[in-house]
């Protein structure tokens, strides 16, 4: 079971009815089912903030010391490493509950990027959601090897949902 909490701090998000708990749960489940190590966990939790440029700028400055709005910020609750996800190690312990983390999305930046990249707002949001969830479970793109692994997984998941890959 995946519990999703959505907080909307910007009314423009309400125009996109497809961006809802059901969509977020479906994508999260698709990602988690790819890794056997998550199979023992019965309940996952994920918090989503749908906000605007002013608020995300404050969060970006506070947590990353970058004074500019960004499309999305991910705050993992656990320090996971993507390499552990592919091993049979019991890296999650015996817990049957896991809070994946928090994700904050910025409406204006996502809107502008989707227009510039000739994508629908919803498809761009889905790509950023996939990217962010992968960050929450330990994926990163600090070097070319990690970036390629993460991008290939994103492409695979996007294709599953019928979305043309951006790379």
UniProtKB/Swiss-Prot annotation:
It is found in: Cytoplasm. GO terms for cellular component: cytoplasm. It is an enzyme of class 3 (hydrolase). The lineage of its organism: Bacteria, Pseudomonadati, Pseudomonadota, Alphaproteobacteria, Rickettsiales. InterPro entries: MetalPrtase_cat_dom_sf_prd, YbeY, YbeY_CS. Its cofactor is Zn(2+). Its EC number is 3.1.-.-. PROSITE patterns: UPF0054. It comes from Rickettsia rickettsii (strain Sheila Smith). It comes from the Bacteria. Belongs to the endoribonuclease YbeY family. Its main location: cytoplasm. It holds the Pfam family YbeY. Binds 1 zinc ion. Zn(2+) binds at residues 131, 135, 141. This is Endoribonuclease YbeY. Gene3D superfamilies: Metalloproteases ('zincins'), catalytic domain (3.40.390.30). Keywords: Cytoplasm, Endonuclease, Hydrolase, Metal-binding, Nuclease, Ribosome biogenesis, rRNA processing, Zinc. The gene is ybeY. One of its GO terms (biological process) is rRNA processing. One of its GO terms (molecular function) is zinc ion binding. Single strand-specific metallo-endoribonuclease involved in late-stage 70S ribosome quality control and in maturation of the 3' terminus of the 16S rRNA.
């Amino acid at each position: 079971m995946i519990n999703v909490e959505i907080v909307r701090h910007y009314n423009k998000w309400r125009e996109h009815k497809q961006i809802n708990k059901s969509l977020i749960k479906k994508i999260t489940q698709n990602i988690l089912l790819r890794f056997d190590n998550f199979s023992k966990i019965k309940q996952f939790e994920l918090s989503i903030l749908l906000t605007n440029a002013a608020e995300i700028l404050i969060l970006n400055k506070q947590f990353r010391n970058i004074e500019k709005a960004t499309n999305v910020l991910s705050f993992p609750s656990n320090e996971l490493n993507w390499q552990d996800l592919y091993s049979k190690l019991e890296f999650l312990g015996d817990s049957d509950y896991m809070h994946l983390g928090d994700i904050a999305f910025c409406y204006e930046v996502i809107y502008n990027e989707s227009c510039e990249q000739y994508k629908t707002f919803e498809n761009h949001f889905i790509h950023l959601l996939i990217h962010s969830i992968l960050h929450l479970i330990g994926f990163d793109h600090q070097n070319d090897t990690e970036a390629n692994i993460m991008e290939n997984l994103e492409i695979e998941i996007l294709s599953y949902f019928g979305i043309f890959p951006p790379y």
